[in-house]
Amino acid sequence: MTSGDTNTYDLIVVGSGFFGLTIAEQAASELGKRVLVVEKREHIGGNAYSEKEPETGIEVHKYGAHLFHTSNDRVWEYVNRFAEFTDYQHRVFAMHDGTAYQFPMGLGLINQFFGKYYSPDEAKALIEEQREGLDPAAATNLEERGIALIGKPLYDAFVKHYTAKQWQTDPTDLPPEIISRLPVRYTFNNRYFNDKYEGLPVDGYAAWLEKMASHELIDVHLDTDWFDVRDTIRGESPEAPVVYTGPLDRYFDYAEGRLGWRTLDFEQEVLDTGDFQGTPVMNYNDADVPYTRIHEFRHFHPERAEYPDDKTVIVKEYSRFAEDDDEVYYPINTPEDREMLKRYRELAAAESRENKVLFGGRLGTYQYLDMHMAIGAALSVFDNHVRTYFVDGKPIDQPRGH
């Protein structure tokens, strides 16, 4: 990162999450372009940012657990330019009716929940009986697909109430695609992710993100709201395209209405014990528990000998609808939202053509994107839209479906 000697830039990036930083880093390192990154928060990195809890020195993911995983060779090669990764493999347990169950859906959960051993074939037959004749491919909402995937008893115990808490929306009103991220296996493999590559940055997310932004041609302005400085910055760099990764509806001043987002609240505690729950993440699936899960961050880095033996940090996570002044995290994506999104995409396409603005990232495209997906999307947008603008002189145009 540099302080900069001039106010003229070749490219402006709004937001410093993985999408924005990937675009900025590639423009600087691959094209030699001078880039300004404008960030509303006091730190870079978006929701992936992490910091040490001062009393214990335990690294805490400030906006909830972030686990890096990908099967994309290009993405894995790219991120390894900026960070070394541990061999961490994510595993989750789920609390239901006072008992912690192995999760996600697999033979461990089935055998424990139903109180007897089922072989793979027996477990498949059991779930077939319990899916109520529903076909996952034909499901029209999350509840139908959930029952079709794991049967009604397991859906009711481990998905229904957790989903309602997480999204503040009835599962019958949520799209079926949301639950497609949930692994379903008929083995005792309890890894949460199936990807080829998985791990956590050895030195933490903050160090990784700062290295991405460290190129001498990149300037970062923190604590800066784009809408307060847009006219000034674009006036000083009138030819510079903008890559906007903030909320899509906010960019257009909610002209088509407010898209449905959810936000998260976090309750952090330092406890006088060396281990609170014995695992990094415990989901709380019952409706009478207000939080969705508890993170215990020491377990993400068991290799760190400097962590204290007599203290630990836990964070309870609560999910709710985002109100007007809240930070928005995830799109709810109801049918009404999807209709509104179509209209916003038309506005985005016009803005791209007329004012050289590209919309990207989770917030800028109203999509649920894991970290590797945001990075992969940014690399694609850079190759097919940013590079072609600077190298071939092609006009800026918004990617289809974004």
Q: Which role does the model predict for each range below?
A:
Residues G4-F19, L36:
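Beta1/beta-strand and adjacent pyrophosphate-binding region of the FAD-binding site
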Residues T22:
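Short alpha-helical segment within the catalytic ATP-binding CA
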